[in-house]
Amino acid sequence: MNSAEKAMQSFLESLGLDLEQEHMEKTPQRVATLFAELFSGRNQRTQDVWGEVFPTDYQGLVAVEKIPFYSMCEHHLMPFFGTVDVIYQPHEGRVAGLSKVSDLVNVLARRPQLQE
């Protein structure tokens, strides 16, 4: 059991939850794994997301709309979710693949942040 799992076990026990019950015995591990995933963007660099960019002659704006996201509010660790529209102008005749914009949103959303 790692330190996050031990801390979660201690927290749940301090609330009076019986972790010996059949459906609760692995809850500290599951919750620690969940939070590791929810905060995984902290360990990722946004510049690593872009990967290959493509040449383009297009001069206008590029829009990727209604990208779903979920994140965690850093005040109370409550989840929030929604959609985001990203609009950007290609720089120096290069454009990112549309999936990379969605990937970038996911990296940024997987960081604790204010939801206000």
Where do the language-model regions lie?
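N-terminal intrinsically disordered, cationic/polar leader segments
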Residues: 1-116
